[in-house]
Amino acid sequence: MQRDCVSPTKLENRIKKIVHKPFFKIALFSTTSMTVLGSVVIAPSLPALQSHFQNIAGIDFLSKLVLTLPALFVMLFSPLSGYLLDRYGRIKFLFPAMAIWSLSGFSGFFLDNIYLILVSRAIFGIATAFVMTGATALVGDYYLGEDRQKALGLQGFATAVGSAVFISLGGYLSSIDWRYPFLAYLLGIAIAIFAYTKLFEPHRKKTKKTHKEVEGSNQKFNFLMFLPVYLLVFFCMVAYYISPTQIPFFIVHNLGKNGDIVGISMSASSIAYGVFSLFYNRFRNIWSIYGIYALGLFLMGTCFLLLYVFHNYLIVMVSLMFLGAGGGLLIVNSSSYLLSIAPEMQRAKALGFFASAIFLGQFFSPLMTQPIVDRMSILGLFLIFTCLLYMLGLFFIFKSRMKKNFRKLQS
């Protein structure tokens, strides 16, 4: 009863104090980092997994599907998760999904059938849809304005740091046995327990809605308004996922390195992703949305240009840092823009389709890139994506200048 008597202003001030506490942020951003950990941690074990199941027909494709199949199910179930989270709340779906995420991910440790592993990865993908949409929606609910931009930067940083640590660990474990990286998913249980003690259902203002909120909740979801963001994110993830799906084979087969070296290489990308995500708010204070898109695309394009021209391990490390830096800027920039234009009562739904675009890109990455590798070699793949990313970056420079000229004419 006492809680109901607290005025909205006092309640909002109390919530603001809670969400800025360090342990609260650790719980929230650890939850968001789980979704990226889900894919990258097993990337270094793919060559060894492929060798283990070498007698299975089509194992070249199936081994990559172990990494990317969850993305297909995230794509399919993220819109549904967004609808349910908007309608019934975030927390009641988030914690069960985290438990399922952890157990289904861990099951790959003891399964010795490639098709059962793929089934477990499908279940894992469904759980990931709810975790990713729910956790990102909570970031949008807990923080506003500049605080939200900072929170999204911290989210990207936490995701990248977790990714760097666990992909390095995954690389080391895969050098012992390809099954061992699946043990890392048990960390999700510990994160879920910790998050359960800190996170709470955000205040949704159910009793007294403003006219704008009622209108927003009844308004039909305008998918076309968000479509350009979804398409851009899809393409960026196709390019970004060349790193875990193709570059491990490039390092092992072309450069003759071991699986533990693959993990260290992937972690370089994650560290750069985190650093550039962390400083996103500073980039945003200087450059426009279009300007940051152009910068991110040029950074990613430079990665593939370096890989195409130079063929040594040091250059691979440097190029993957360019890839991570560009990817971090592009994803945080897109999520920040999306949260700024999405109505409050449709936020989770918009983020659900955003998650679908991300994981659809991850799923289609090997489907789109492997035929190019088969026909033109992996170097041909690097050249094609260099050209595509640079051309798209030039397009956003043009858009940015057009917008500036339009503003000058108006003034």
Listing of model-derived features with the role each one plays in the protein:
Residues 46-75:
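Extracellular/periplasmic helix-loop-helix junction of adjacent transmembrane segments
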Residues 65-82, 267-279:
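Central cavity-lining transmembrane alpha-helices of secondary-active solute carriers
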Residues 75-113:
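Conserved MFS/SLC helix-loop-helix module at the cytosolic interface between two early adjacent transmembrane helices
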Residues 77-89, 276-288, 373:
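Helix-to-loop junctions at the C-terminal end of transmembrane segments
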Residues 100, 104, 115-123, 314-322:
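Paired small-residue
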Residues 114, 120-159:
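Cytoplasmic helix-loop-helix junction between adjacent transmembrane helices
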Residues 145, 154-200:
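Helix-loop-helix hairpin linking two adjacent transmembrane segments in secondary transporters
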Residues 226-267:
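Extracytoplasmic gate region of multi-pass secondary transporters
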